[in-house]
């Protein structure tokens, strides 16, 4: 009995560690790029509109990919879908660090797709596997996500100024999804969940006609708009006035 309890405890600890490490990736690769926008713009000779597109592409990916996340999870399972999200983020970081403006934009879009999957699936995983501790786990992963975002923003400029350049600084951020990827490999071996059918599927279709769902969507959308505008342009604005 004690060995079974110990094994269950280890699995839970690994699951929690994996969730928190995934949470570190869901903002840091976005916030880490913001302080370097001026350097990126100068290096490639980008216009203001093109530079703005770098901060907009992830948001467009969120809007396009997020509605597809549930279908991906039904097809491959939550665990494997989150593994795919980490792979996409790693690939996107590598692509945007290549010496080409085209790859910069492509990599940024790929990163946005990976983050979109993680944003949708991670709260669902917490609700499924920690149904008795949803508030505690949600608070822990939100705190971890915010802390990693702040850490990334603080690190990239000193790293870039130390001789690694903005590409090296952005590439350094791959540490976060790589650690999450490695920690999540044991979880990804779990059997994918069965497709959602019957009343559950009908409920998901009915949500498009729910007034409450649209109100929540509007509230969270405005909240995200304010957050990403500040994250994307706050650092360049402060740098421009010498802070």
Predicted feature descriptions by range:
Residues 33-34, 211-243:
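Extracytoplasmic gate region of multi-pass secondary transporters
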Residues 102-108, 216:
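Short hydrophobic/alpha-helical segments at membrane-entry points of transmembrane helices
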Residues 31, 59-67, 150:
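Residue-level signature of mid-helix packing/kink "hotspots" within the transmembrane helices
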Residues 2-9, 189-216:
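Juxtamembrane intracellular "pre-TM" segments in multi-pass secondary transporters
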Residues 15-48, 66-69, 230-235:
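Extracytoplasmic
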Residues 101, 132-133, 139-189:
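Helix-loop-helix hairpin linking two adjacent transmembrane segments in secondary transporters
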Residues 64-102:
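Conserved MFS/SLC helix-loop-helix module at the cytosolic interface between two early adjacent transmembrane helices
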Residues 108-143:
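Cytoplasmic helix-loop-helix junction between adjacent transmembrane helices
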């Amino acid at each position: 009995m004690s060995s079974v309890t110990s094994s269950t405890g280890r699995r839970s600890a690994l699951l929690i560690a994996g969730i928190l490490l995934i949470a570190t990736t869901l903002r840091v690769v976005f916030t880490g790029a913001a302080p370097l926008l001026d350097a990126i713009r100068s290096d490639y000779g980008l216009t203001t509109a093109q530079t703005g597109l770098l901060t907009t592409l992830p948001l467009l990916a969120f809007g396009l990919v997020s509605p597809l996340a549930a279908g991906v999870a039904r097809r491959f399972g939550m665990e494997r879908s989150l593994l795919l999200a980490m792979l996409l983020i790693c690939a996107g970081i590598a692509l945007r660090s290549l010496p080409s403006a085209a790859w910069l934009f492509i990599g940024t879009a790929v990163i946005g797709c990976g983050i979109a999957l993680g944003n949708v699936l991670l709260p669902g995983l917490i609700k499924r596997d920690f149904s008795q501790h949803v508030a505690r786990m949600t608070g822990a992963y939100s705190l971890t996500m915010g802390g990693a975002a702040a850490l990334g923003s603080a690190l990239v400029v000193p790293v870039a100024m130390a001789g690694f350049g903005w590409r090296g600084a952005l590439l350094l951020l791959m540490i976060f999804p790589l650690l999450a990827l490695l920690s999540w490999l044991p979880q990804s071996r779990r059997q994918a969940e069965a497709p959602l059918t019957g009343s559950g599927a009908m409920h998901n279709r009915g949500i498009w006609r729910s007034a409450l769902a649209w109100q929540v969507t509007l509230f969270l959308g405005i909240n995200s708009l304010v957050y990403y505008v500040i994250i994307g342009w706050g650092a360049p604005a402060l740098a421009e006035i010498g802070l």
